[in-house]
A protein has these predicted regions:
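Membrane-interfacial helix-loop segments of redox and metal-homeostasis proteins
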Residues: 1-172
């Protein structure tokens, strides 16, 4: 695996882990807001909302899977992002765009931009789950530094993108 592939591989894994960790912490800290977002989707009976903690717990477990599987699996991250994308897609198709996505971070209503963002994250899940990563000792430091830098830059871009979406919705009066 070339150095560029290695940097992309670990950078995309790092950004997935950071995004899922951020979303999970946000859901645990703002459980009332998260329960409200789940309630807004209208797909779950009220009694099922007492199990709200399962979603951020699965996100935390997927972070551990990403960090400790070293390229073998991104199954949980792919599964949870696929479910989120399917829920968002379904609600966009039926015209229910006035819902908080419940994604983590600033309150953002459903939009095709959110769906597109999740699609890109799904691509990162696939591209970062290629097995057979071989780390060559003579390039280890440069690859690690590049992967960490790339992952942090992607995470910062993700946060900026979410903030821009939220600001655009406020400015447009949505």
């Amino acid at each position: 695996m070339t150095m560029v592939n290695w940097v992309f591989f670990f950078g995309s894994a790092l950004v997935l882990a950071l995004i899922l960790l951020h979303a999970s912490v946000h859901k645990f800290r703002g459980r009332i807001d998260f329960q409200s977002a789940l309630r807004g989707y209208g797909l779950f009976p009220e009694r099922a909302l007492i199990l709200w903690w399962v979603v951020p717990l699965v996100e935390l477990i997927s972070v551990l899977e990403i960090l400790f599987s070293v390229g073998e699996s991104r199954f949980l991250a792919f599964l949870i992002l696929s479910l989120y994308s399917a829920l968002i897609f379904y609600n966009l198709i039926i015209g229910r765009t006035n819902l908080d996505c419940g994604c983590g971070g600033v309150g953002t209503k459903l939009s095709w931009w959110i769906f597109g963002r999740n699609t890109i994250l799904l691509i990162f899940c696939i591209s970062s789950s290629i097995s057979g990563v071989v780390i060559e000792a003579d390039h280890l430091f440069l690859c690690a530094l590049g992967g960490i830098t790339f992952g942090i830059l992607l995470f910062a871009s993700y946060l900026v993108f979410n903030q821009l979406l939220s600001n655009a919705q406020v400015l447009n009066g949505d």
